[in-house]
Each structure stands twice: as structure tokens, then as C-alpha cells.
Amino acid sequence: MSRLLNDFNQSLHKGFIDKHISHKGNYTPKLLVNNKNEKVLSTIIDELQKCETFYFSVAFITESGLASLKAQLLDLSNKGVKGKILTSNYLGFNSPKMYGELLKLKNVEVRLTDIAGFHAKGYIFEHKDYSSMVIGSSNLTSNALKVNYEHNVLLSTMKNGDLVDSVKSEFDLLWQKSTPLTEQWINSYKESFEYRSLEKLAEVEQTQMLLADKVKKSVEIVPNLMQAEALRSLKAIRDKAKDKALIISATGTGKTILCALDVREVNPNKFLFIVHNEGILNRAKEEFKKVLPIKNDSDFGLLTGKHRDVDAKYLFATIQTLSRDDNFKQFDENEFDYIVFDEAHRSAASTYQRVFNYFKPKFMLGMTATPERSDELSIFELFDYNIAYEIRLQAALESDILCPFHYFGVTDYVHQGIKEDDVTKLRYLTSDERVNYIIQKTDYYGYSGEILQGLIFVSSKKEAYDLADKLSSKGIKSVALTGDDSVNYRQIVIEKLKEGKINYIITVDLFNEGIDIPEVNQVVMLRPTESSIIFIQQLGRGLRKSSNKEYVTVIDFIGNYKTNYLIPIALSGDQSQNKDNYKKFLTNNDSINGVSTINFEEVAKKQIYNSLDAVSLNQNKLILKAYEEVENRLGHMPLLMDFIQQHSIDPSVIFSKFSNYYEFLVRYKKIDTLLTENESKNLVFFSRQIAPGLKRIDSLVLEELLKNELTYDELKNKMLNEVKDITEDDIDTSLRILDFSFYNAGIEKIYGSPIIERNERMIRLSDAFTNALSNQTFNMFLEDLIELSKYNNEKYQKGKNGLILYNKYSREDFSKIFNWNKNGSSVIMGYMIKSQEMPIFITYDKHEDISDSTKYEDEFLSQDELKWFTKSNRTLESKEVQKILSHRAKGIKMYIFVQKKDDDGIYFYYLGTAGYIEGSEKQDK
């Protein structure tokens, strides 16, 4: 029996006969649903990545659903992989524009069936030796692939299987009777589609007119879930007699409405709203009018260069006008009960400070999307460190507050194979070849709606002007806007874009903030990412909801830039500086919730990986910057758990550069209290051995012994009764770690004196450690590290045998998890058989300078098959090799750990358990 057939037999046995068998198999049938941890879309993308051809049979397709597969389909096209899509015009659901998008797929043949009631949802993938299918309830729509509660089944079958033959035969039968999709067919369909759309529109308008007669002229606006939570937080702050608060809210998340709702709740006698831009000011006033009870229009006034409505109950002022002495001093300092500073990160500027320091309202609220932007005073300090609520991009998308987006990281134009790593050297930014390439990409990835209304961000003014001319000459109406243009001219151009009279506004950084163009349905980034904050600001220009679009397309041209690593940082919102997190984000198709998707073309993704590999994210200056940002937020020295709670740097990054956090604080003079040498070394121990949270039992045993000394039996019984899924061996290992007997001789030079002492009867804290506990500062750091250990341990709870697939582990970690008496780091040379475990640690790319005898040619033969070499000087008759060949009979489990190259340090990715393939052994030398 072939290995593939055997794998199928075991997979199907597990799927249809006995779920308890240990074989996990690559072909086990699987139910596909959409939930927080998995999406139907990710399976379809995964199958596409591996297939040699594909066939989709789906009744309903949306532009957004198709967009979520476009990057993958383009990569397949570049590899010569072709496919077929069979759909229909059933119920007139599919739009003419969507059919046009299907025609852009050069490697996909599309046909339409006129079979009555066509309602199929099937995806077939042909691989080299087998086929797989996703069949169930999901159409090719964003909601069906990512959000809706769906039931689909992933089935795999051998090429000669009856099921795949039946499904493929049915597909072929329909395909032969179907009509090829053409421009002519689309034009014909468009006429009937528009007629039906007009009929539906008339029905909707008639319904709206009937409803309008029954609805009051003024409808009370109620808060959404996130706004309601923020309002409760603001009230709680005021209830504590605090008079300032800060709202951090992603662009487009409705912070103005939130503010108006709070003002309605407070009902101040007089209210002041301050912002830097008159356009924002007018929009804010209109938003407030929708929320607040209006008695007279005169209740709302403006204080600008042209308006002086100083007696209005609700006054909206530009900072440029208000900050003049003769303007703000005409008011009494207590005149306003409630003052709002919009774009509050500007509040540290001198113009704002004059106003900020003059007025004494009962309550002052700051609102910003980017509190980190200030280069002067701390915004957090200005608002007394009272963060009422924080709405970041991911959370806003999950709550459906923002317009969904499809992000495409695409490969930038390469001139004659030359890769430039400095945009200022690239002479071809606006060459005809690159402009044609840009048009090709932006057309392929498209936009939602009938008219293209986009923003393009470039690197220089000259590039903006030249690109606008080139695009316009090719029929794509474009206008460049820069800081040299007047405010009035900018507004005229913006209105043209809103009305669809032009297709693109091209700028450098003019629209990073303070601009509101909800109609934008495509954002194009033609410059390297230099700042994750600016990246999100520019992406955010398209995230306001608008009736002209269902989603916004974001196209990011990724060149050979050193700063590409900032892209996953920006998109994920993850400020941990942890490279592993960013690499997982790049490979995880479920990395963002809601119908939004993040997609990378294969070459572009490789360029980001290269940038991540090259950059050092644990530089002292980056750690110090993260520290100062959190310190600014809190107003005091942060502890390690503060970094976690403030979504800042991962403490493990600090430990990769400093032996412990105390050492970092001393280096940068952030702490006055000094510890003894032994106390500092003990903190090194806790930072390296306890804080990672590898085993929950370690921190629990420590906490028990911190309370009082115990006999071994007392400790054992307490742990076994109170903690699930632990053994006596786990407790013994924890004790060996705490008394340092787990480690090799001389470890005290690094970790100081042991933490505990024990004899045949009692276990207690060592004298040196007891003395350290009398130091309040040492205690503070210790408690923080224990809390960090508990937090980190949560990610290990779901692991079988303490190991989680694709997590990173060291040889020492393995020794702890499997309760070896001693740290095996120095004795596991590639692999080791001990008890019933055999960990295998493989470095895939060896250094060129290692000896030929150890330059093993380990190699992945397939996704689940590895060619592996034993140590040198072994034969098939060697006792060790015989153990490996008979490992199943002897009950020995193999665990595979892999790192890419020696430079990756002591950590290896865990790929799972393995088994020897009978008959595959060979003595090479």
C-alpha cells in the first residue's frame, strides 16, 4: 500500500469511523465555519496555494468576495495555474460590474449556466496526487467567506475516487451546456439589471416616503455598543470628580458623534469645540445638530475668521482665531462648562496651550486618533492620564463602525530587473513603463462602486505633478495637491473628487489627517512606509462609510525597501516589536476580523520577510522609545505588565537585550533605588526561567512557597488538588528549577543564590532570597514577573504535552516540559533519545564553514515528509539507529523542531510529531 493511500485510509477512518484514533492526517474531513479563530476563506486560499488547477461552481458572487481572492489568483496566473468558474445570473443577484471583474482574471475561464434554480456552492481543487473539495453553504461573497454562520465540509479524495469523479462529471456536464462570459453578454445583462434596479429603487423610495410621514422630523441618535461603553467611562471619570479625559479613536469611528452624545448627557450651559480646520469645524457643527435638542439655530455658532457668534450656547471655534489674545480673553475663564479639543495631539502646540491654560471648564475632553504624534508636551499629561476609551482600527472594523477594506500588498515596478532600495534614486517613478504598470495593477484590483474616486500617496511633489499629468493623458483624470496650493483650491479639487469629476487626487502627505472624503473607494500607496502611524492615517482616508461603496480597495506598491517591516506592524496594530508575531500575521489569512482582508502578492510578501529578517527590533533606542511612550501614558515608571496592558513592546524583547528589566532601568537612569548584585541576578533568573510562562506550575509552586514553608507532601497534595492537568513529575521539575539542581554547575554566577532550599522533610525559601524579599523594590519586580508568567502561560494552555504547533522552543524548554532531571541544552546535539521521547532539532541552512561530517543535508520532500540524517559515524546496525527504526514498537515519540539558520539562536519552531517511513532508511556514507 502506498504511503498516500495509507494516509487516506487513516484520515477517513478518523473522520468517519473513530474520532479517537491519534492519526491527525492531512486528508481528514473537516467542518468549515466562520468564527473568531478560523474562516472559510483561509481554507480556500490554502487550497488554491497548493493546487494545480481549480473549479468553482457558485451561484452568487460579489465584487468584495472576488477581491478577497484576487492576489492569490494573480500569483497562480504567474505560475501558469489555470481554473474555471461556473456561475449564473440567478435572481439577478450578481452585478454587471462583478462580471467585468471576472473577465480581468486572465488564468480563469468563466461560464454562465441558465439551469433553473442554480444554487450551487462548490470549490474543487486538483493537486498532484489527490483532489479536495469545499462543498456547503458559502457563496463567493465576503460575508459567506468570513462572517456569516456557514456549514461547509472540506473533503479530500484520491484521483480515482467515486465522489470526486461524480462532482467533477457534474461540473463538466454543466460546463459544456453553459455560455462563455463575454463583454457582449455583460452589456446585454446590464440593461435588464439596471431596469430591475430602477424598479427596486422606486419601491424603496415609495416605502421611504410612507415611513417619512410616520417618523418625527428629528430622530434621536442612540449610541452604538462602543460609544455606549465610552459614555459610561466618561461618566465614571466625572463621578470621581476628575475634570479631564482623553478619547483615542481611529479615524472614521464616530468620535464627533460620541462627543455630541456625551454633551447631550451633560447638558452644559455653554459648550466650546476647538479644532484646527474650518472644514472639520463645519462638519462637527452639523453632527452636533443631529444629536442635540435644537431650540433655535442661533444656539449653534462659529468663531472663525468670518464668524463671531460668541453668544451661542454651542460654539465651534478654529484654534487659529480663538488663540489670539483679543479673542479668547473676551470670555471669562469659567464661561464654558464643557470644552472639547479635537485632534488633541495638537494640544501641546503653543497656540493650543494659551487657550488650554486660560479656560477653567467643569470638564475638558480631548479626542485624537494618534496620541503619540506630539513632539512636545505629553498629551496624556495634559489630560491628567485619564484615558476614557480607546478605539483602535481592528476593534472598529470588528464592530462594523468603519467601511471594510481589501488591502493588497503588490510588487512594485522593477526596471529591467534592477531593484532600487532607495526611492530617491529611482529614476523611473513616473516613466511610461511604471505608469502603465500602476494602471494595470489599480485596474486589476479595482474599486467598489460605479466611479473611481481615489487618493494616491507619493514620495515627492514632482512625482505627484508628473504622475497626475501622465494619468490624465491616459484618460484617468487626476490632480496633484501639495502644501503649495491654497486652502480654497484644495477644497475645489476635493469637491471635484467627491462629485466624480476627477478620478484621483495625488499628494505627498497633505491628507494624512484632518480631511474627510467618505466617497474615496481606492487608496494607492506609491511610497515606502516610513511610519506605521502615517501608514494607518493614509489608509484611513478611505475608511469612512459612504453610500457609493461597499468597501475600499487599498493598493500598496511594495519595493525593495528596508522599512517594509513596518507594514505588518501598521496593519496588525501590534506594537510588541516581536518579529514572530509579524511573521505569523503575514501568513495568517484570518488576521483581521469582519469582511476586510489583507492580501500580499508572493514577491511582495518575500520582500517584507527579507526586511523583517534584516532589521533589529530590539535596539536599545526602540526599547527606550517604547518605555517613554508608556511612561507618558501612565505618568509614572511602568512595570512589565504595563507594557502588556498598554499594547506596547513585548517584555521578551526587553529580555533579549537586557538581562532583566531592572538592568534597563539602571542603564537609562529611570530608577533611583539600587539592588544588590545577588538581587539583580535573582531577577535575571525570574526573567529568563519563570516569566516566559512555559509551565503554569512553576509560578504556582513559587507563590505557595512565598506564603510559608511546606513539607514535600503538603506541597504535592495542594498542587495536585488545586491545579488541573499536572503530575508529581511536574512539581519535582519546578522544585529542581527553583533550587537550581536542574541546571549545570556554575549557574549561580548568572542567577545568584538558589531561590529555595530543601531537605528530606521541608521546602523553604533560601536565606539569601528571604533577605531579598525585605527589599520593597525587589518585591515589586518579583510580583510583576510572576504576573507576567501567568499572562504568558495562557498561550500554552491549549498545547498537548505542553507543545503548541509552530510555537518556538529551545532544547531547555523541551527538557522542562518533559520533566527531565537536567537541562538537556548541552547534550541534545541535533537529537537525543531519553525515556520515551526523541526531540529532533534541525537547522535547515547550515553555515558554510562547518565540517563536512556535520553538514547534514536535511530536506523537506513535501509538506509532511522530511529527509533526515542521523549523527555522523552511525550505521544501520548502530544501536541508536535501530532504536529509531523500531521507535513505534518501543513507544518512542519523535518531536520535530526546525530553525531556518544558525543565526536564529536557541529557538526552533515545533512542527509536530513524526514517524519513520518503513523501508526508506538508507546508509549514505
Indicate where each model-derived feature is located:
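Conserved helicase ATPase core of P-loop NTP-dependent helicases/translocases
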Residues: 282, 307-310, 327, 465-466, ...
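PLD/PLD-like phosphodiesterase catalytic module centered on the HKD motif
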Residues: 1-224
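A short beta-strand element within the Helicase C-terminal
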Residues: 135, 504-507, 511-528, 534-537, ...
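Walker A/P-loop
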Residues: 239-263
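Conserved interdomain linker/interface between the two RecA-like ATPase lobes of SF2 helicase motors
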Residues: 387-455
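Conserved segment of the helicase C-terminal RecA-like domain
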Residues: 532-537, 541-571
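Post-DEXD/H (motif II) to motif III coupling segment of the RecA-like Helicase ATP-binding lobe
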Residues: 345-406
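Long, largely alpha-helical accessory region at the distal end of helicase-like NTP-driven motors
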Residues: 194-223, 443-444, 448-449, 453, ...
